[in-house]
């Protein structure tokens, strides 16, 4: 019994020392570094690994970049050829990765002006938020894991791509809008686009509300699509393997909707010539013979479309 008690005590001591070591390794030193920018710039480029990124208006007319970061993973901030660049500098050794950090890096960019040229962000993990106070010529965001909230407009293209995360684009105008996510939800609300809107979601739902554009294309494997008050001048094209497609007072000159497993229901604003097919399900569409084409195909699901009276 005494030998068994000593063994238990020894195991407890070893476990406690291991836990303390793990905790010590987990608690990385964090610090706030503020970079004041005096040079003039037009473009913004950020390349980082793991960090939340936010753009907010400067309250004193000065540009600065505040980096709350690990001591061994810092960021260089400088202006090069008219571009404000923020790049990660990783000085960690392999043993510095032992453990789990309980804090997270954050980059806050305080901008004095309202309009800039290009914004390019490349990140691995973290959330990104761009305030509605800014306007760019173009926006290009590439992210592995994290949410993106874009409230800033662009005169040309807005491109947002993520592997895993939710993407929000709200109250903006753009020349074109291209959103791609492998796993996550896409929400597009109150958006005016002179050109095309493309939404690609492999697994996840897509919600579009109060949107106008030239052409709308939505593709994906699994997930519902909701179009509410979405108006395309030329074409709406929706393709899904599994998921329902809902149209609420939405319209285009021509519509093409395909889903393998799911219902297609809702209302349009103008008459269409309906071309429909379902292997298992019922079809209920107007018998109109004027208007553009509305082709709807589903293998397993109902097709129910009406023309709004309003």
Which stretches of residues belong to each language-model region?
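Sec-dependent N-terminal signal peptides of Gram-positive bacterial secreted proteins and lipoproteins
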Residues: 2-27
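Acidic (Asp/Glu) and glycine-rich low-complexity loops/linkers
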Residues: 19-143, 149-162, 166-181, 185-200, ...
């Amino acid at each position: 019994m005494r030998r068994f008690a000593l063994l238990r005590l020894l195991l407890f001591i070893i476990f406690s020392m291991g836990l303390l070591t793990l905790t010590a390794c987990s608690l990385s030193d964090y610090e706030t570094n503020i970079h004041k920018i005096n040079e003039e710039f037009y473009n913004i480029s950020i390349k980082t690994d793991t960090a939340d990124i936010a753009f907010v208006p400067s309250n004193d007319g000065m540009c600065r970049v505040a980096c709350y970061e690990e001591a061994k993973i810092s960021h260089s901030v400088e202006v090069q050829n008219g571009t404000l660049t923020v790049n990660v500098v990783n000085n960690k050794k392999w043993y510095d990765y032992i453990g789990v950090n309980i804090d997270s890096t954050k980059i806050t960019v305080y901008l004095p002006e309202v309009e800039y040229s290009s914004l390019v962000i490349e990140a691995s993990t973290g959330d990104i938020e761009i305030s509605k106070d800014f306007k760019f010529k173009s926006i290009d965001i590439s992210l592995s894991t994290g949410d993106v909230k874009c409230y800033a407009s662009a005169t040309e293209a807005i491109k947002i791509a993520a592997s895993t995360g939710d993407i929000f684009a709200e109250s903006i105008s753009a020349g074109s809008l291209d959103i791609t996510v492998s796993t996550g939800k896409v929400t597009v609300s109150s958006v005016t686009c002179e050109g095309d809107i493309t939404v690609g979601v492999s697994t996840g739902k897509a919600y579009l509300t109060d949107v106008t554009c030239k052409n709308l294309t939505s593709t994906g494997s699994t997930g519902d699509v909701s179009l509410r008050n979405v108006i395309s001048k030329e074409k709406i094209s929706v393709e899904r393997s599994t998921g329902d497609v809902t149209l609420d007072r939405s319209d285009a000159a021509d519509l093409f909707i395909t889903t393998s497993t799911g219902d297609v229901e809702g209302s349009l604003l103008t008459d269409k010539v309906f071309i429909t097919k379902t292997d298992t399900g019922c079809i209920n569409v107007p018998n109109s013979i004027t208007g553009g084409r509305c082709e709807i195909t589903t293998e397993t699901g109902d097709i129910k479309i009406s023309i709004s009276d309003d």
